[in-house]
């Protein structure tokens, strides 16, 4: 059958990138040094709309430099990075550097109305940050209006002393694998719909490195799929990123196994498995040895995961690429398909994560061990509720969309992003202003929800009388302040209100230690004894299991205003977020500097 080829950057877009890059280099007066000797890495991101045709439909998509996924940023630990963003799209946006510590550099975290005002159409903005003390796979993405569905790319940090210093055999080649979704919709409109309580929008497919694969077709013409060429006996490091807006995925390669060696740019004790599980926002580094018969072709399959009925079922689409041996690249025989876990096998995800522990090189770059105890603790429920439309104080709740809006919440408060006319939260904090802006209501994230209930009772629903028995959700700019250097425990508790959703919770500006996870309701007297205080994995994104909990510990040692949120994009739009404000320490070296001069 014929195949539908993926789109390529247009000549016009390439010309714009080249021209803008040349202008920036001339203005700055700095040449870009060679990769071998470079301490400074410089990129230009031109954000624009390009037409792409898939599934028999041509649409304009917002991308960077005319490509999907966007450019890969490759750096060495200790390098400085400069990225000039030229916004030629019709949308406001920012770029977030997912997982980068941004130590004493919160101004460059890239979150609209938290750390900066968004970059408006036909405006430019320059991000500057260092990648000190980190090695591994991170990524970058837009942080506004669902645009990260097409505005994203890999950020790879290699060891300062080269690939020979990896704590695993040096790979023959390193390969980014980005799992995403294909949307036949205007993504900012999807964001507006969900912010207003309407949930009828779903993706049309899943992708591997921007390609839908041969499970999809247009009038019988198969979609182009990603192809990984390998050499027999060689070792490959797959840098896997879940850039999807909605779904956790199983990833499996027929006839091959993975050795998972890192997650979220933190080394792990090597873990051998035939399937990896990855949630939105997470990264995994996995070694694959090309040791299958080279005469064969092997599918690389990615399958979304969702909780089984009676939880809400949504359209989910698997995708697949192909692993083939270079000595047999002309082989057109049928590829072998791996036997995939069932899409409802959420416990497979739970046990996969339970097998991950920190590697022996955790403490490289002076990273601290997990503190033995916490200075303060939060118990944070993740749920749904409703607020009255049009700012009303009283309305019929329980799914009456004419009077109320279904929102997501943390401890029964739904996060409201400050309006564009307000002052960004970081700026308000730095200049000691009490509020994020005129007319913006702030509320402190409480240590616990306002009322305890049976959080995992599956009779609970946000669309009926049970929801109406709970307190009405409030909507505010939700913040929580921490003393510099405080050790903080957070237990995230999933609730049945979420209708089967797990929750990948991401904290900006910090890694957290994943101490434990469980199914059911967290009980401190019973569950604190399960905390791993020896070798817990370090993460920037932690999946809270469906009808379960996850306990994390972090040290609030990076001053600034850091967003904490669910990385399911619709949960963020609906309000499952808060801002963790870390106060300055006692010295200049522990205090946030003023904003950059050109900020």
Swiss-Prot record:
Gene3D superfamilies: Cupredoxins - blue copper proteins (2.60.40.420)
The keyword Signal is assigned to this record: yes
Molecular function terms from GO: copper ion binding; hydroquinone:oxygen oxidoreductase activity; oxidoreductase activity
Annotated positions binding Cu cation 4: 503, 566, 571, 576
Residues annotated as glycosylated: 51, 92, 124, 193, 217, 331, 355, 412, 454
Subcellular localization, as worded in the UniProt entry: Secreted, Extracellular space, Apoplast
GO CC list: apoplast
Chief location bin: secreted
GO BP annotations listed: lignin catabolic process
Cofactor annotation comment: Binds 4 Cu cations per monomer.
Enzyme nomenclature, EC number: 1.10.3.2
Positions of Cu cation 1 binding: 96, 506
Keyword check for Glycoprotein: yes
Cofactor(s) demanded: Cu cation
Top-level taxon of the source organism: Eukaryota
Domain annotation Plastocyanin-like: ranges: 46-162, 173-328, 444-586
Binding, Cu cation 2: 98, 141, 567
Catalyzed chemical reaction(s): 4 hydroquinone + O2 = 4 benzosemiquinone + 2 H2O
Keywords per UniProt: Apoplast, Copper, Glycoprotein, Lignin degradation, Metal-binding, Oxidoreductase, Repeat, Secreted, Signal
Binding-site positions, Cu cation 3: 143, 508, 565
PANTHER family on file: LACCASE-15 (PTHR11709:SF343), MULTI-COPPER OXIDASE (PTHR11709)
Function as written in the Swiss-Prot or TrEMBL entry: Lignin degradation and detoxification of lignin-derived products.
Descriptive protein name: Laccase-15
Source species: Oryza sativa subsp. japonica
Gene that encodes it: LAC15
């Amino acid at each position: 059958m014929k195949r539908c080829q993926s789109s390529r950057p247009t000549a016009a877009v390439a010309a714009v990138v080249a021209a803008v890059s040349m202008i920036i280099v001339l203005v700055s007066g700095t040449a870009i040094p060679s990769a071998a000797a470079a301490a400074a890495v410089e990129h230009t991101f031109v954000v624009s709309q390009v037409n792409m045709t898939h599934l028999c439909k041509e649409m304009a998509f917002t991308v960077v430099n005319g490509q999907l996924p966007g450019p890969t940023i490759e750096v060495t630990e200790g390098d400085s990075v400069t990225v000039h963003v030229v916004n030629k799209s019709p949308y406001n946006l920012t770029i977030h550097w997912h997982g980068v510590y941004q130590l004493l550099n919160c101004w460059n975290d890239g979150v609209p109305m938290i750390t900066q005002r968004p970059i408006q159409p036909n405006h430019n903005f320059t991000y500057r940050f260092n990648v000190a003390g980190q090695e591994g796979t991170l990524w970058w993405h837009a942080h506004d209006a669902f645009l990260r569905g097409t505005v994203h790319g890999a950020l790879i940090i290699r060891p300062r002393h080269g690939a020979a210093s990896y704590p695993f055999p040096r790979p023959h080649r390193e390969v980014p694998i980005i799992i995403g979704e294909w949307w036949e919709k205007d993504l900012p409109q999807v964001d507006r719909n969900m912010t207003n309580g309407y949930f009828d929008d779903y993706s049309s497919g899943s992708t591997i490195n921007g390609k839908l694969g041969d499970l999809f077709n247009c009038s019988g013409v198969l979609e182009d799929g990603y192809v990984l060429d390998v050499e027999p006996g060689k070792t490959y490091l797959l840098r896997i990123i879940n850039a999807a807006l909605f779904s956790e995925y199983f990833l499996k390669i027929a006839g091959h196994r993975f050795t998972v060696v890192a997650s979220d740019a933190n080394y792990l004790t090597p873990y051998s498995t035939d399937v990896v599980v990855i949630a939105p926002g997470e990264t995994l580094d996995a070694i694959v040895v090309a040791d299958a018969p080279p005469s064969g072709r092997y599918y690389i399959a990615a399958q979304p995961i969702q909780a089984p009925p009676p939880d809400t079922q949504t359209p989910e689409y698997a995708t697949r690429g192909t692993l083939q041996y270079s000595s047999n690249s002309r082989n057109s025989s049928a590829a072998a398909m791996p036997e995939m876990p069932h899409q409802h096998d959420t416990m497979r995800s739970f046990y996969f994560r339970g097998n991950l522990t920190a590697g022996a090189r955790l403490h490289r770059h002076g990273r601290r061990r997990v503190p033995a105890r916490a200075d303060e603790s939060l118990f944070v429920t993740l749920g749904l509720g409703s607020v009255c439309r049009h700012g009303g104080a009283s309305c019929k709740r329980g799914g009456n969309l004419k009077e109320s809006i279904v929102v997501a919440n943390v401890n029964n408060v739904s996060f409201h992003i400050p309006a564009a006319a307000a002052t960004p939260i970081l700026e308000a904090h730095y200049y000691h202003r009490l509020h994020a802006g005129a007319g913006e209501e702030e509320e402190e994230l409480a240590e616990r929800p306002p009322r305890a209930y049976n959080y995992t009772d599956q009779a609970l629903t946000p669309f009926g009388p049970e929801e109406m028995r709970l307190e009405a959700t409030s909507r505010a700019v939700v913040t929580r302040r921490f003393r510099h250097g405080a050790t903080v425990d957070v237990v995230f508790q999933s609730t049945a209100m979420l209708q089967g959703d797990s929750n990948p919770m991401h904290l900006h500006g910090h890694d957290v230690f994943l101490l434990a996870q469980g199914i059911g309701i967290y009980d401190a007297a019973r569950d604190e004894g399960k905390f791993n205080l020896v070798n817990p994995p370090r993460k920037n994104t932690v999946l809270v299991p469906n009808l379960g909990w996850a306990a994390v510990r972090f040290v609030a040692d990076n001053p600034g205003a850091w967003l904490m949120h669910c990385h399911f994009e619709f949960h963020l739009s609906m309000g499952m977020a808060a801002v963790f404000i870390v106060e300055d320490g006692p010295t200049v070296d522990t205090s946030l500097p003023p904003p950059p001069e050109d900020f």
